[in-house]
A protein has these predicted regions:
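N-terminal maturation segment of proteins
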Residues: 21-579
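Positively charged n-region of N-terminal signal peptides that target proteins for export
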Residues: 1-5
Length: 579
C-alpha cells in the first residue's frame, strides 16, 4: 500500500513539475507574442480595426522608408527571438500551435518585404492601403464618431501616396501598374460618390465641413496617383511579374507551410482538372441530353430569378441549406444568429458577385454578419441584366451560398468565435484553409445529397462542377505563370479552354493571377481537407462521423492544414502527407 502511495505521489509531483514547466514556457512565449502583436497593429492599424480591436481606431498607415525599414528589422528580430526560444520543448500543445502560427505569420510578412518586394514592386499595395469601408460596414459606434476616424484617414491619404512614390523601383510589372491605376481611380470615385452618400446623414455641420475638405483632398490625391502611374510608370513597366520557381517554393512554405514542389502540385492539379471535366460532362448529359457541356450549362443559366426576386429567393434558399446541415448532421451550428442577406452596398459592387462580410473575432458591438448579393443595375441593358441573373441561376446561387455561408465562411466564422483558441489563432488565418474549407463545402454538400437525385441532382452537380473547374484552373495557371513564364494571354486562353469562360472574365482571372498567386489555395486547400478527412476516418473507424470531422477541423481556428494534421491525427508518420 505504501509503495502504491509513493508511486501515486511521485506521479502527482512529476505532473505538477511538468505543468509548472509548461506554464513557465507558455508565459515566456506569450510575452514575446504580446510584444510582437502590439507593434504589429501599430504599423497596420486598419487590420486591427477590421479584427474588432478599436484601440487602433483613427490611427493611419505610414509607408515612409524609415517606417518600412524599421518594421522589416522588427520582423527579423522577432523571427530570431522565436527561433532561439530556449523553452520551446516545454510549451504546451496549444502554445506550440500558436508558436508555429506566429512564426508562419512573420515569415509570410518577411516574404512580402524581401522576396515579392511588395513595397518596391507593387503599386497596388499603396492604391488599396486605405480601407475607408472598415469604418462604414459595422455600427460599432455612432456614425459621427466613425466619421471622425474617416476624416483622419482622408487627411493622411495625400502624404501617404506622395511618400509611396519614393519606394517604387522601376521597372514595375505592367499588370500591377494597370490594376493599381484602376484601383486608385475606383477609390477616388468611391470617395466622391459613395462615401459622401454613406455619411450624409451626420447632422454635425462642423464635422461635415471637415469631412468635405478632407475628402476632396483625398479624391484629388488618388486621381493624381493614378495619373502619375499612367504617365511615369506605365511606359517603363515590363511583364516580369512572375515569382520564379525558387521564390514560389518559399511563398508556399511561408504562406501555408506547404513543402510539396510546385511541379508535383501542378501534376495533381492537371489530373484533377481532367477528372472534374469528366464529372462536368457526365452531369451535362443528364441535364441536356445530346447537347455539349457548355450548352447544358447555358440551359441551366436560363433558370434564374427575376431581378425583384433575387434577394428574397437567396434568403429563402439560404434557410433551406441551413436546415439541411441540421437534418443531415453535417456540422454543429454554434449560434442561432443568421447572416443577413442584403444587396451589396453600392460602394462595394465593383467586381463583387456575392460575398460574406463577418465581423472581426474581437468585435463586441457591431456584430452583424452580412451575406451580400450584388443586384442588377437599373441602367444596364436587358441583355446585361439577363446575363447577370443567369450567373445567379437557382443552382449556382445555392452553391455560392454553400461557399459563402452554410457551411462555408459564415459557419467557419461562428466556430472561430465560439472556439477556445487563442488570440493568435483568431488573428492569423491560412488562405488555404479558409478558402479551401468554403470550396470543399460545395462538393461535400452535393456529395451528401443536397439537391436530391435524378435531374435536379445532376443540375446541382453541374453547377458545383462549374465552380470547381474555375478553381482548378486557378491552381494550374498560378504555377504556370509564376514558375513557367506563362503570359497573361496564354493564361486567358487556358481559362477559356478548360473552364469554358468567355474572353473578358477569363482575362480578369488571368490578371488576378499576376498579383495573387495564392488563388491556387482554393483547390489546394480543398484537396488537403479531403485527404485529411480520409485519414481521420481511417483513424477513427467506428467512432467516425462527418460531423465529428467538421467540428474538429473548425474548432482549431483557421490554421494551415499541415498543422491541423498534427492536431487531429495520432500517427506522426503521416503528418507531412498533406495531399
Amino acid at each position: 500500500m505504501f509503495q502504491k502511495f509513493c508511486a501515486a505521489f511521485a506521479l502527482i509531483l512529476f505532473t505538477s513539475v511538468v505543468t509548472r514547466a509548461d506554464q513557465a514556457a507558455d508565459t515566456a512565449f506569450q510575452k514575446i507574442a504580446d510584444d510582437f502583436l502590439h507593434g504589429y497593429f501599430l504599423v497596420r492599424p486598419l487590420a486591427g480595426v477590421s479584427l474588432g480591436l478599436h484601440e487602433f481606431d483613427g490611427l493611419v498607415p505610414d509607408c515612409s522608408p524609415a517606417t518600412l525599414d524599421a518594421e522589416r528589422k522588427r520582423l527579423h528580430d522577432f523571427d530570431a527571438r522565436l527561433s532561439a526560444f530556449a523553452d520551446r520543448k516545454g510549451l504546451s500543445a496549444s502554445a506550440e500551435f500558436d508558436y508555429r502560427t506566429l512564426r508562419l505569420a512573420i515569415q509570410d510578412d518577411l516574404f512580402n518585404f524581401e522576396e515579392s518586394r511588395e513595397f518596391e514592386k507593387n503599386p497596388m499595395t499603396y492604391a488599396q492601403a486605405f480601407d475607408f469601408n472598415v469604418y462604414l460596414k459595422r455600427d460599432y459606434a455612432p456614425l459621427a464618431d466613425r466619421l471622425r476616424f474617416i476624416v483622419k484617414l482622408a487627411n493622411a491619404a495625400p502624404a501617404f501616396l506622395a511618400t509611396s512614390r519614393m519606394n517604387l523601383v522601376d521597372p514595375l510589372p505592367r499588370p500591377k501598374v494597370t490594376l493599381a491605376i484602376d484601383i486608385a481611380r475606383g477609390t477616388a470615385e468611391f470617395l466622391e460618390k459613395d462615401l459622401a452618400q454613406a455619411v450624409s446623414g451626420v447632422k454635425d455641420e462642423a464635422l461635415m465641413a471637415e469631412f468635405r475638405e478632407a475628402n476632396a483632398k483625398a479624391v484629388a490625391a488618388f486621381i493624381e496617383y493614378a495619373a502619375w502611374l499612367e504617365k511615369e510608370k506605365l511606359p517603363r513597366a515590363d511583364d516580369h511579374f512572375a515569382l520564379g520557381e525558387e521564390r514560389y517554393r518559399k511563398f508556399l512554405a511561408a504562406r501555408d507551410a506547404i513543402t510539396l514542389p510546385p511541379e508535383k502540385i501542378l501534376e495533381i492539379g492537371l489530373a484533377e482538372l481532367k477528372r472534374e471535366q469528366g464529372a462536368f460532362a457526365t452531369a451535362a448529359k443528364v441535364v441536356a441530353p445530346g447537347k455539349t457541356p457548355i450548352e447544358a450549362m447555358r440551359e441551366l443559366q436560363r433558370d434564374h430569378p427575376t431581378a425583384d426576386a433575387l434577394i428574397p429567393d437567396t434568403r429563402k434558399n439560404l434557410e433551406s441549406i441551413r436546415q439541411f446541415l441540421i437534418d443531415h448532421q453535417i456540422i454543429t451550428l454554434p449560434s442561432e444568429v443568421r447572416a443577413r442577406v442584403e444587396e451589396t452596398p453600392t460602394y462595394q459592387r465593383a467586381g463583387s458577385f456575392a460575398s460574406m462580410d463577418t465581423p472581426g473575432p474581437f468585435e463586441k458591438r457591431g456584430t452583424e454578419a452580412y451575406y451580400y448579393v450584388t443586384p442588377v443595375e437599373p441602367e444596364w441593358s436587358d441583355k446585361e441584366k439577363d446575363e447577370w441573373l443567369g450567373a445567379f441561376n437557382h443552382y449556382t446561387a445555392d452553391v455560392v451560398s454553400i461557399h459563402e455561408a452554410y457551411p462555408g465562411h459564415y459557419v467557419q466564422f461562428l466556430h472561430l468565435n465560439a472556439s477556445p483558441v487563442s488570440r493568435i489563432a483568431k488573428m492569423f488565418g491560412s488562405y488555404a484553409f479558409t478558402e479551401g474549407w468554403a470550396h470543399y463545402c460545395e462538393q461535400m454538400l452535393v456529395d451528401e445529397g443536397f439537391g436530391g437525385t435524378g435531374l435536379e441532382g445532376a443540375k446541382y452537380r453541374l453547377a458545383q462542377s462549374d465552380e470547381a473547374l474555375l478553381r482548378i484552373c486557378r491552381l494550374c495557371v498560378s504555377i504556370k505563370m509564376h514558375c513557367h513564364s506563362m503570359s497573361v494571354d496564354d493564361a486567358t486562353k487556358f481559362f477559356q479552354d478548360n473552364c469554358y469562360y468567355e474572353e473578358k472574365p477569363a482575362r480578369q482571372e488571368a490578371m488576378r493571377g499576376t498579383f495573387d498567386p495564392g488563388y491556387l489555395f482554393y483547390t489546394l486547400g480543398k484537396l488537403q481537407l479531403l485527404k485529411l478527412r480520409r485519414d481521420f476516418e481511417k483513424q477513427e473507424g467506428a467512432n467516425y462521423s462527418l460531423k465529428k470531422f467538421h467540428d474538429a477541423v473548425c474548432d482549431h481556428g483557421q490554421a494551415p492544414v499541415r498543422l491541423l494534421r498534427e492536431a487531429l491525427l495520432h500517427d506522426k508518420s503521416g503528418w507531412d502527407e498533406t495531399l
